[in-house]
From Swiss-Prot:
Keywords: Dioxygenase, Iron, Metal-binding, Oxidoreductase, Vitamin C. Residues 78-178 form the Fe2OG dioxygenase domain. It comes from Burkholderia ambifaria (strain ATCC BAA-244 / DSM 16087 / CCUG 44356 / LMG 19182 / AMMD) (Burkholderia cepacia (strain AMMD)). Its EC number is 1.14.11.-. The keyword Amino-acid biosynthesis does not apply. It holds the Pfam family 2OG-FeII_Oxy_3. This is PKHD-type hydroxylase Bamb_4192. Coiled coil: none annotated. 2-oxoglutarate binds at R169. Fe cation binds at H96, D98, H159. Its cofactor is Fe(2+); L-ascorbate. One of its GO terms (biological process) is DNA damage response.
Length: 227
């Protein structure tokens, strides 16, 4: 499942993040690449240990913790600290798949990458190209979202970023280890939760059907979740 999650950051929060990011020191993006990704990657990135990356990443994680749609879709167990990249002047990232396990350098913190996320930090009309293209059995899905919006997709997907030919694309990217490892199971839970929320809004939280479906949701989560 590929999902557009709007409004993770407000316009004011995006502006605050960009003020810090634009003044930071950026390095060759291959500093964090695996061997296969390094063959396809041409962009710039903030070093993982950068104080700016930590500060802006903390702000993003705080926003994610308050975002009900993100929690419902991802069911996060662990989130890898957000990283940051920028593309300009024809920079691109060719087709690749993300590493299955991400290790935070200098620590024993590990994340199984069940889901990948890209949070856009530049408005789409400010640059040409820079589309995130995610492949699945139904074809190629493209994302180029407003600043502050996030796209979530299975980390097992082949994906690429098209060349940026005008302006600059700035984004945060990170990985999520979900409580529910299987993408199909996680998607079913998300669909069920969405319908429960809609029914609750229509009939009220005390409606017998809402209570029954909520019980089914939690029993499925109990069956499938690692916690």
């Amino acid at each position: 499942m590929m999902l557009h999650i709007p409004g993770v950051l407000t316009n004011a929060q995006v502006a605050q993040c960009r003020e810090l990011l634009d003044a930071a020191h950026w390095v060759d993006g291959n500093a964090t690449s695996g061997a296969q990704s390094a063959l396809a990657k041409r962009n710039r990135q903030l070093p993982e240990g950068s104080p700016v990356a930590r500060a802006v990443g903390d702000a993003i994680q705080d926003a994610l913790a308050r975002h009900a749609l993100f929690f419902s879709a991802a069911l996060p167990l662990k989130v890898f600290p957000p990283l940051f990249n920028r593309y300009a002047g024809g920079e691109t990232f060719g087709t690749h798949v993300d590493n299955a396990i991400r290790l935070l350098r200098g620590t024993d913190f590990r994340v199984r990458s069940d889901l990948s996320a890209t949070l856009f930090l530049e408005e789409p009309d400010a640059y040409d190209g820079g589309e995130l293209c995610v492949e699945d059995t139904y074809g190629v899905h493209r994302a180029k979202l407003p600043a502050g919006d996030l796209v979530l997709y299975p980390a097992s997907s082949l994906h690429h970023v098209t060349p940026v030919t005008r302006g600059e694309r700035v984004a945060s990217f990170f990985w999520i280890q979900s409580m529910v490892r299987d993408d199909g199971d996680r998607t079913l839970l998300f669909q069920l939760d969405t319908q429960i929320q809609a029914l609750s809004a229509e009939k009220g939280a005390k409606d017998p059907m809402v209570i029954s479906l909520t019980g089914i949701y939690h029993n499925l989560l109990r069956k499938w979740a690692d916690a």
